[in-house]
Amino acid sequence: MPEDSNTNDNNKRPLEDNNAVDGESDDDIGPMLPPPPGEDAPRKKKRTLAHEKLYLDQLPCADMYEKSYMHRDVLSQVAVTKKDFIITTSVDGHLKFWKKTASGIEFVKHYKSHLSSIVDISISANHELLATISDDTTLKVYDITNFDMINMIKLRYKPKSVCWIHQSGQAQALVAVSEADNSNIHIYDGHADGKPLHTLSKMHSKPVHIIEFNSRFNCVVSVDAIGMIEYWSPEAPFALPDNLDFELKSQTDLYEFRKKKSVPTCLTFSPDGLSFATMSFPDRQVRLFKFLRGKMFREYDESLQAVSEMQQAGTTIHHLDDMEFGRRLAVEKELEKSNQARFVNAVFDNSGNFIIYGSLLGVKIVNIRTNKVVCLLGKSESNRFVNVSLYQGAPKKKAVYTLAMIASENAALKESQELDPTLFCTAFNKNRFYMMTRREPFDDINQKAERDIFNEKPSREEQTVAATQERKQILGTSAIIRTTSGDIHMRLFPDAAPKAVENFTTHAKNGYYDNLIFHRVIKGFMIQTGCPFGDGTGGESIWGDDFEDEFSREFRHDRPYTVSMANAGPNTNGSQFFITVAPTTWLDNKHSVFGRVTAGMDVVHSIESAKVDKTNKPLDDIKIINIDIR
């Protein structure tokens, strides 16, 4: 696992220094002489990346996602093109085109592309063509710039993976499609009638689930179901290209997955084509390879065992409480068993110095030169982010700049050149995709819109959640009880006791509690108020009648400063409430807990210490001035 930039935890040593020049190394071979007396041993020079801050300024950095948009079903993949278009697909066969704008994204077009789940998509090297394949045995080709479907090929088999394998400017738009039930790979002309130009049946022995094209070196890399990796040329006779630095696979580390009995879920090339990254299951390793030599030079351990050990040792980059960590661990195990595991991926940034991928803790940005985690995106979110794609363009940028424009001091021109780095992510079992930017949600105080955009008709479950959230906002989640002895701040629990909270907040807003006294105070036990008669015999709910008890397993009378409803027996709640000053567990399942004091405990104890008469009523009235709901 890569190190946190703020810690000094030891990591697995990288297999090769990516920055080292041939013939140079940080380590000398053989034993070293001890340093002269009085001198410290020479320290190794730390690896650094020149201008790292400049690179980081062009990457997202927010703890939370800024916005999310919907599909009708669970999303499978998201892809970004160089021409500022975003493509999203879902398991119900739907495809959507979006356009990156200065303020976010805009919806462009929606296709019911396939009758079944979209298995894989591929964008051509010139970012002009999109190919999609589905379990409905069809291959569809789209013109990305014009958002049009320009070809449909009916396949005679169930496809597994798809990839454009032609370079920019090439006459034929070649696309490779693998079969799900055998090792065949078929090559088609994406603009033709669908008859295969070639069929490769001996390249692999098992079904191929990953095909990627390195346009710089005109080489295809394919991976099969047992982790075997093959390099081949996209032209007949489809042999090993001549421009590689090896002749035999035994000279490389391409057998690594077969040795470890693990299978990659992705293979992503760096922008310069010199490296590629993989993520794999079940060993959960992130590996980086030199493309020309096929040698592995980085390996990051993201296994559940490693993460659990770091959590227990307190050395994780973001420590979670035990309950949240256990929940995320369960989600990881569920993800590995699901079909969505095949969409787990890693991507490079434009500089090729950083790799970005989802993990249990959030989305990690790792500096592969220094082996440090430089940023953890979405660490405050509960989602498990799966498929990611990075945008690093300037959405306002003009196509052509004149010399006069460049030389001018035009503020609008400078603004048009500003980058808006955005990471687009899908999440496990979610019908939304998420945008991670350099902005936290609602950084703009004038922004009133929700960050979860309902661009599709929500399901019943989502409508219920939205209604609950809206109800919580109306009721309020905190209150300040202003008394003649001082202010008491409290947090409310609308989820656990919705009726009690609604009753309390409505009474408070209507001024019902204003000038009421604390009529019952018992030292070491509690302070009670809310009776309009001041003797504990009165008070009614906002509905006129008593309302039922609301007991919760999560919120009990197990600690002081618990705010609970007073009653005269089961289901007799009115307006009176009390605040405990000690654990009072015998009150559980007898009184409804609806809040806890978060500040002003000294005020509570001040009221508790007041002198009282035989009926436990303070000799000097202590009044509620008003209650502020927030």
UniProtKB/Swiss-Prot annotation:
Catalytic activity reported: [protein]-peptidylproline (omega=180) = [protein]-peptidylproline (omega=0)
EC number, as in UniProt: 5.2.1.8
Keywords assigned: Isomerase, Repeat, Rotamase, WD repeat
Highest taxon, organism lineage: Eukaryota
Limits of the PPIase cyclophilin-type domain: 475-629
Gene3D superfamilies reported for this sequence: Cyclophilin-like, YVTN repeat-like/Quinoprotein amine dehydrogenase
InterPro entries for this protein: Cyclophilin-like_dom_sf, Cyclophilin-type_PPIase_CS, Cyclophilin-type_PPIase_dom, Cyclophilin_A-like, WD40/YVTN_repeat-like_dom_sf, WD40_repeat_dom_sf, WD40_rpt
Region: Disordered, residue numbers: 1-46
PROSITE patterns: CSA_PPIASE_1, CSA_PPIASE_2, WD_REPEATS_2, WD_REPEATS_REGION
UniProt WD repeat ranges: 70-108, 113-152, 157-198, 203-242, 258-301
PANTHER family recorded: PEPTIDYL-PROLYL CIS-TRANS ISOMERASE-RELATED, PEPTIDYLPROLYL ISOMERASE DOMAIN AND WD REPEAT-CONTAINING PROTEIN 1
Job description of the protein: PPIases accelerate the folding of proteins. It catalyzes the cis-trans isomerization of proline imidic peptide bonds in oligopeptides.
Family classification: Belongs to the cyclophilin-type PPIase family.
UniProt-recorded name of the protein: Peptidyl-prolyl cis-trans isomerase cyp15
Source organism: Rhizopus delemar (strain RA 99-880 / ATCC MYA-4621 / FGSC 9543 / NRRL 43880)
Higher taxonomy: Eukaryota, Fungi, Fungi incertae sedis, Mucoromycota, Mucoromycotina
Underlying gene: cyp15
